[in-house]
Design a protein with these regions (language model features):
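Short acidic-hydrophobic, aromatic-tinged amphipathic segments that line or gate anion-handling sites
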Residues: 148-152, 198-208
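Short, acidic loop-to-helix structural element flanking the phosphoryl-transfer center
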Residues: 74, 78-121, 129-132
Length: 216
């Protein structure tokens, strides 16, 4: 049996780090006359006069992955994309905390207990520089899982082809579960209203659910 853990929301608290960075660079600094703006050519932040025509703001917790612009307010979707994947990918995806202090201890224990009978996989929806940032995140916390697969909206079918059970916080995966696949929802603010046959609150709870599923 191939058991996969999805990173965002299940293992990594991505939006907490994004909130901290947004607060610092788009709210706190925009209260001043000059703000810091990332310059790709110089690979550094430069001082720029404040544009008061747009009001930045946060609306949290995140309730929808499909409408992040409602929670992290930018002038357009390109600016939202750049925030996550161009300007701050290492800070957001690499330096984000784990969902709980014990998350990686629990994950590594699951890996060590099940690896002889099952293939344990880490999967994650990543774009561009968020991939190396995610590898840094996993190494930072001492993740022992050997197989890591990145996917996107274009390659998601290949992700499903390589797994049998998915532990995820992504509501789209719960709602679009393929036949003959098992999806276990890990509860977050943005999937509370999505029904799932199997639900856990954190990675550690998978241990008890595994026994009930009788996968030996």
């Amino acid at each position: 049996m191939r058991i996969a853990f999805d990173i965002n929301g299940t293992i990594r608290d991505t939006f907490l780090k994004a909130e901290q960075l947004y607060q610092k660079f788009y709210i706190d600094e925009y209260e001043e006359d000059n703000v810091s703006v990332y310059d790709e050519e110089k690979d550094d932040f430069i001082s720029q006069e404040n544009d008061e025509s747009f009001e930045y703001g946060l609306d949290l917790p995140v309730k929808s992955l499909d409408h992040l612009e409602n929670h992290f307010k930018f002038k357009d979707k390109d600016d939202l994309f750049n925030f996550f994947y161009v300007d701050f990918p290492m800070q957001i995806f690499g330096h984000a905390p784990s969902v709980e202090v014990s998350t990686f201890n629990e994950l590594n224990e699951i890996y060590e207990e099940l690896r002889d009978n099952h293939e344990i996989i880490i999967v994650s929806d990543e774009i561009g520089k968020s991939k190396p940032a995610t590898l840094f995140f996993l190494s930072k916390y001492g993740c022992l899982v050997e197989k890591i697969k990145f996917y996107s909206n274009i390659t998601i079918d290949s992700m499903w082809d390589e797994i049998d059970i998915l532990i995820t916080s992504n509501p789209n995966h719960v709602l679009n579960q393929p036949q003959n696949k098992t999806v276990i929802k890990c509860t977050t603010s943005y999937n509370e209203d999505v029904k799932s046959e199997f639900t856990i609150k954190n990675v550690g709870e998978f241990k008890e659910l595994y026994k009930k599923l009788n996968l030996e």
